[in-house]
Amino acid sequence: MAVVIRLQGLPIVAGTMDIRHFFSGLTIPDGGVHIVGGELGEAFIVFATDEDARLGMMRTGGTIKGSKVTLLLSSKTEMQNMIELSRRRFETANLDIPPANASRSGPPPSSGMSSRVNLPAIVPNFNNPSPSVVTATTSVHESNKNIQTFSTASVGTAPPSMGTSFGSPTFSSTIPSTASPMNTVPPPPIPPIPAMPSLPPLPSIPPIPVPPPVPTLPPVPPVPPIPPVPSVPPMTTLPPMSGMPPLNPPPVAPLPAGMNGSGAPIGLNNNMNPVFLGPLNPVNSIQMNSQSSVKSLPINPDDLYVSVHGMPFSAMENDVREFFHGLRVDAVHLLKDHVGRNNGNGLVKFLSPQDTFEALKRNRMLMIQRYVEVSPATERQWVAAGGHITFKQSMGPSGQAHPPPQTLPRSKSPSGQKRSRSRSPHEAGFCVYLKGLPFEAENKHVIDFFKKLDIVEDSIYIAYGPNGKATGEGFVEFRNDADYKAALCRHKQYMGNRFIQVHPITKKGMLEKIDMIRKRLQNFSYDQRELVLNPEGEVSSAKVCAHITNIPFSITKMDVLQFLEGIPVDESAVHVLVDNNGQGLGQALVQFKTEDDAHKSEHLHRKKLNGREAFVHIVTLEDMREIEKNPPAQGKKGLKISVPGNPAVPVIPSAGMPAAGIPTAGIPGAGLPSAGMPGAGMPSSGMPGPGMPGPGIPGAGIPGPAMPGPAMPGPAMPGPAMPGPAMPGPAMPGPAMPGPAMPGPAIPGPAIPGPAIPGAGIPSAGGEEHVFLTVGSKEANNGPPFNFPGNFGGPNAFGPPLPPPGLGGAFGDVRPVMPSVGNSGLPGLGLEVPGFGGAPNNISGPSGFGGIPQNFGNGPGSLNAPPGFGSGPPGLGSVPGHLSGPPAFGPGPGPGPIHIGGPPGFGASSGKPGPTIIKVQNMPFTVSIDEILDFFYGYQVIPGSVCLKYNEKGMPTGEAMVAFESRDEATAAVIDLNDRPIGSRKVKLVLG
């Protein structure tokens, strides 16, 4: 069932296709769109089904050609009545609308003949009148003496300039319709009908030749006295019609409903009164000129502009003018992007609204190779886009050369500067308000931004905040209107990396804003000022700043401001730290207005910021400036502490072995009780190592100042006791080796005088602590060699795991090779040393024991120890740490470094630590190497060392191996990044 909907608000430029496009997707049968027009812009649409009508009603409030439309339910009866009413109005308009010469003196309308009606009947035959027409005219003249001006006026309204246009055959249809009323006019002479009996003499009528009336035509020439016709200009009802565009009836207010352009196009066969066709004739120019003296219909300046979208980027002004060929184009402005290239859009200014209306009809027509869209524009858009190029001409004296419709609204009063657009000046001052200036912007940057424009001297004002930094606001005053409009066209153009907003502002408004800014600075409270500076000018110790760390490296100011939402912070008070290359450091500094605000930010500690936990620390302004100058390395927990002998060695705080600084709990080890060395003063702790069955093996304590004296046994490290007496031997200096401790009774060893070994040590009985990581390999080699047995043979031999395959020579077996102990002749247990066979009941000792008793009795035939005892784990580097023994502790005077291995997984050696591997677990299966490198950003990861692990099917397991350049780097990474998320999973880091 067909349903009718009534549409109101249809613009005059819309047609049936626009309505169908508005209801696209709905079924409208052919002939289902009826445009009625009228003051409400009405149309009726017939839908095929109820569902289509229901969906169509839901589109009420939409826009057609930029005009909002309203939809109402209707019926076929209402539609037919409205169409019929519109048709009647249109037909009666031909008879009822006052004619162009109605204002002149003449007979009243009740005379039975309208001059408008007879105009077509007389004008078309004026150039070549027929005898019948002449007789009709003369008869009318004779029978109606009181209509003296009819024939003359009607003839006078058709000047010769009309040519044959009025005599075209198309008017033949109107001649009969107008001739019939002419036949009804002669009734006045009918009264003589009673004399009809005299008809017999009618035969004499034939002798009356029709030509004789032709001679009577000469009297017609008296028409020239029609000079009174020039009184036509005063007609007041015609201006709307004469101002009507050639095919643009809408602007004419008096037009009847149905003639507003939304109906059928104007034609010569649609019973339209020929008076409306005046604009199509040369007479139109006369009428338009005559309108110049009539100011009853001012033209809206916005009716002169159109916007063109989708033009080819190569289009030039000539291409646009060619596209609007036949129309009077005043100016063309092609819009450009910030680089200066055409962006495919433009604005066109025409000389009259008629041209604008015709230009809108060229919407979606082809320009070069692209279909462009033409839509209405406003004067404000023209000026904002750079219309100043021609705008000044149209306002100046040259504007008088343009048709009066263009200059009327601008010359109506001296205050022509006060126009409806908001981007124009409202008084003599040509001032602009700038927003978004870079904080480091100066006057020279503003001058360069407005280069080639005349700026009033000393008129540039850049606003600064209480902290002395620019707020991004500024003001500039120009000398003339043209430069002012050109400055407005710089809106959203770039100054450096920021685009600047240029807004118009009156001079009064500018001065008020500047005054407000100055008052704000003056009213800045002393308390707040004290937060920044104390009376002496020194930096205050109030903690009004925050140092945010462990944030993504791509963080921006806006991200930080969102993170601090709820705490008043200025954008200028946020500073994201970057390195020399402009890369983010994952840190930010924020300066708050009050100390309370700073303390509020502490509640955000460990809150998520773009997926990472942000660490918020409150600092003073002085600290903030120091951090800003020297940003700390991200993720380094250790502090640089000055240590004697090596002041630049980082000390890693931890709860591990005393002074060792290794972040772990106490590491078990096999205690090797140390025999105190003479002169040591305080015996050192025994060397822990893996558990070994049998008696404890004493180690050599690290001596203090060389002072001869009796040996003092050192305390044994805790551990499961092993039966058997402790064997004598030199104490082993250095850090404790991991493994369960096995104490045995310490057997005093010979007093060996010698200088103290400089460098690292372990806690002595006196309580002193020395950082054992501070001794370099160079320092360790300064003393004579200390030979210590290294390879204990036995069935329970073990060794550190081999390095992962495929990691190259840098991760080779770095087990230290123990130097030969030589043949000292000391009786004791047989110990195997690398490359030497150890005889039972014999222990090799230093050759310096020559004058000292060497036989300490018989011990067990052998003591099994794990091979490679003292060797370090893989990953300690190709150069293990060295510790020097006391002098004369070797077979010769030359240096003999001792290679001490640390506990598995930790670098206990000093000097140059080698590469270290970290095992990353519980990663997302889709993780990439780049994501892993980004996760460890800031740490010294060896390039190309990231190795993802796959199962036998080639599927990722979520694990990877990452190599770091040093042990410290790997340790710091484990401490800082363990349990941190990669994606949605928290990864586990295991030191390899």
From Swiss-Prot:
Q: Please provide the record's keywords in A-Z order.
A: Nucleus, Phosphoprotein, Repeat, RNA-binding
What are the start and end residues of every segment in region (Disordered)?
A: 393-424, 849-913
Listed InterPro entries: ESRP (IPR050666), Nucleotide-bd_a/b_plait_sf (IPR012677), RBD_domain_sf (IPR035979), RBM12_RRM1 (IPR034591), RBM12_RRM2 (IPR034594), RBM12_RRM3 (IPR034855), RBM12_RRM4 (IPR034856), RBM12_RRM5 (IPR034854)
Taking every annotated instance into account, which residue ranges of this chain make up the domain RRM?
Answer: 304-379, 430-507, 916-992
Q: Which residues carry this modification: Phosphoserine?
A: 352, 375, 420, 422, 424, 525
Output the Gene3D superfamilies linked to this UniProt entry: 3.30.70.330
- What residue intervals traverse the membrane? none
Biased amino acid composition, Low complexity: 876-887
Q: Biased-composition ranges for Polar residues?
A: 408-417
- UniProt-annotated location(s): Nucleus
Return the SUPFAM superfamilies for the record: RNA-binding domain, RBD (SSF54928)
Where is this chain primarily localised? nucleus
GO CC annotations? Answer: nucleus
UniProt-recorded Gene Ontology molecular function terms: RNA binding
- Superkingdom of this protein's organism: Eukaryota
Q: Which PANTHER family would you find in this protein's record?
A: HETEROGENEOUS NUCLEAR RIBONUCLEOPROTEIN-RELATED
Recorded protein name is RNA-binding protein 12
Please tell me the species this chain comes from.
Mus musculus (Mouse)
Gene name as annotated = Rbm12
